[in-house]
């Protein structure tokens, strides 16, 4: 799809707030069981190896999974189930750079969560040092939460129903049948 076709999409072809919320709920349901298995595996591995590396890899895995799904398939599992696609200005799946920009708030939030999560373990100097940063990461998470809320609320009030992260990345969430 070229940029000209993007201009001809109707307002109803762009996915609104509540349908995106439903996609997020589906994501949680679809990913929950595998996520719990990965969590249990990586955390038990961390304890048995006396290393935080498996826990850090767990956080990295979920970031990479999100980015991969957007670049390769044009959406998260929930979006794909609901026949939505994430596209860029050229009407194609987002590039790696666009997917990274699109997920910047989630990546930052995950880093803060990782710092707090790893600091709960007392395995090596890594967790001891991260424990020093945990209060700051926790406070920054509290600041990031309302920013992420505003980010998602943009969908309800912007032309083409774009979240702040969509605007930053140059992406759109559209009905699959429209492209």
Describe the function of each predicted region.
Residues 1-179:
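Membrane-interfacial and juxtamembrane segments of integral membrane proteins
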